[in-house]
């Protein structure tokens, strides 16, 4: 048996495997892809942290709080031992004139295929992380990912140099004009795509208020179904909870709309392992603080009664 959250995710995986089309991609890994899909999660029924594999709430929550703070430097993440953005910052460093270590060309693919190189890569990455944490000048130069999510959410800059806090504006709109159809935040800033370590995959989200409940719909242009989507589901569900609390509302639905929904060819075995599992009951979320969303800390958030199958490892496509 599957709970409703895991079932929706499993059905998407099965549909992509069954009818998806093979496509090449930016990373040259290869994918099975489907264009256009939608999932709906009733957040009053629990918190959609998948149970058919262990998903780290700490990584999800600290990344979301990083976005909310408007931060774009991995130093904050590393302080929580959150490594999910490391490869993009590391890539910038090893391509710079300041790097004089072993050849790191195509380190992502090489580390998967060559164990001796993988050991060298891990050592270089560990040294890089230590420098980010302990050297402010180095962190400022090589820890910053450019104008990624946090910058666009909190400090969108137009062509005239005006700065716009989208997230704060939307929260104020929800409080003062809940029936507006303009509760939208966009991370897709066409004029700044080239300044980002990775163009935003989850590009735009909209809030909807009905009967005292706040719902959120995310449009995700590019969706890594195995590694990324379980995080995205939980992240935007958490964001909905935080903003609902900020605005004195209950939670409604999280609606997840996909553009290119894909399974990487080197994730298929991992997906099949997950699909063979039964689920547990979903956990619940506690927000143990009345602080503003902009002042919430990770320690204020609590996942209750989370039971899951073991994590399943798979390589990230850089």
Curated annotation (Swiss-Prot):
Which compartments is it annotated to reside in?
Cytoplasm
What InterPro entries has UniProt attached to this entry?
Thymidate_synth/dCMP_Mease (IPR045097), Thymidate_synth/dCMP_Mease_dom (IPR023451), Thymidate_synth/dCMP_Mease_sf (IPR036926), Thymidylate_synthase (IPR000398), Thymidylate_synthase_AS (IPR020940)
Query: Where does the signal sequence lie?
Result: none
One GO molecular-function entry: thymidylate synthase activity
From its record, what is one biological process in GO terms? dTMP biosynthetic process
Ligand binding ((6R)-5,10-methylene-5,6,7,8-tetrahydrofolate): 224, 317
Q: Which UniProt keywords apply?
A: Cytoplasm, Methyltransferase, Nucleotide biosynthesis, Transferase
This chain belongs to the protein called Thymidylate synthase
Give the originating organism: Staphylococcus saprophyticus subsp. saprophyticus (strain ATCC 15305 / DSM 20229 / NCIMB 8711 / NCTC 7292 / S-41)
**E.C. number(s) listed in UniProt:** 2.1.1.45
């Amino acid at each position: 048996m599957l709970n409703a959250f895991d079932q929706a995710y499993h059905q998407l995986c099965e549909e992509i495997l069954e009818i998806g089309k093979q496509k090449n991609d930016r990373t040259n890994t290869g994918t099975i892809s489907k264009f256009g899909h939608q999932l709906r999660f009733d957040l009053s029924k629990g918190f959609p942290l998948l149970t058919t594999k262990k998903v780290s709430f700490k990584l999800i929550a600290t990344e979301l709080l990083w976005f909310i703070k408007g931060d774009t430097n991995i130093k904050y993440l590393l302080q929580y031992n959150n490594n999910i953005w490391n490869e993009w910052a590391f890539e910038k460093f090893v391509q710079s004139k300041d790097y004089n270590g072993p050849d790191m060309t195509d380190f992502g693919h090489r580390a998967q295929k060559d164990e001796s190189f993988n050991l060298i890569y891990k050592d270089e990455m560990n040294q890089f992380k230590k420098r980010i944490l302990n050297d402010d000048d180095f962190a400022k130069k090589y820890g910053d990912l450019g104008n990624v999510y946090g910058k666009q959410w909190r400090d969108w800059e137009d062509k005239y140099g005006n700065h716009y806090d989208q997230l704060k504006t939307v929260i104020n709109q929800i409080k003062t004009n809940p029936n507006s159809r303009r509760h939208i935040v966009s991370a897709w800033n066409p004029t700044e795509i080239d300044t980002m370590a990775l163009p935003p995959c989850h590009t735009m989200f909209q809030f909807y208020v009905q009967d005292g409940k706040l719902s959120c719909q995310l449009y995700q242009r590019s969706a890594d179904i195995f590694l990324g989507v379980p995080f995205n589901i939980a992240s935007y569900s958490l964001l909905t909870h935080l903003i609902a609390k900020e605005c004195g509302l209950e939670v409604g639905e999280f609606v997840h709309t996909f553009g290119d929904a894909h399974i990487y060819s080197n994730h298929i075995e991992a997906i099949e392992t997950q699909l063979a599992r039964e689920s547990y009951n979903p956990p619940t979320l506690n927000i143990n603080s009345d602080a503003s969303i902009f002042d919430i800390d990770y320690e204020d958030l609590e996942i209750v009664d989370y039971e899951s199958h073991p994590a399943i490892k798979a390589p990230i496509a850089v």
